[in-house]
Amino acid sequence: IILFHEGNISKDDKDYISSESVEYIKFINVSEYFEKISLKLEEEEKFNLGYRQMCRFNMFHIWNKVENYDYILRADEDVEVLKFNPHIFEYMDSNNITFFTGRFSKEIHRKTNETLPDYLTKNTNLDVDRIYNHKFPYTNFYASKVDFWRDKNVLSLLETIALSDKQIIYRWGDIPVIGGVLNHEQERIRLFPKLEY
């Protein structure tokens, strides 16, 4: 288990979390991606800089941090899993599955819907009408094959989106970016079998 943190977790907290887990937990400090940025943020009262940087991390930087793994299972700290196939990676491998999600989601953030499609049209070769279809995976709990995201063309596309100042300014989340890339690559987004969370 990997627990990414912003350098704000004490040794006592790490020890406590580790003592409550049957699995070994590797704590990785990713505070380098959460430094102060001087940009005028739209809707700053709703979404602070840290939230926007968390979205950036989860759409782009994470793939460099997990490059030595074949698969990842992302579970945000607010997720409680009640029923789940513990052999999901083996299932994905034997069935050549790239991506599982807990549920689908539309992008409901107005500023993202107003600005991201236009940015994609101007800065990528994506068929925006086809890929920005609101058939996106909800990203608080998913499993994915890492090498899909480590592909140089996919990483380049993610970099173009994630490292744009507009991602921070307008609070583009990882849902439409992850979903849009999967749609662009024509990767089927599947629902986890036998999941309750």
Where are these regions (language model features)?
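Short, surface-exposed basic-aromatic patches at helix termini and helix-loop junctions that form
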Residues: 15-23, 72, 86-94
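Conserved beta-strand elements of beta-rich interaction domains across eukaryotes
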Residues: 8-9, 32-34, 78-80, 106, ...
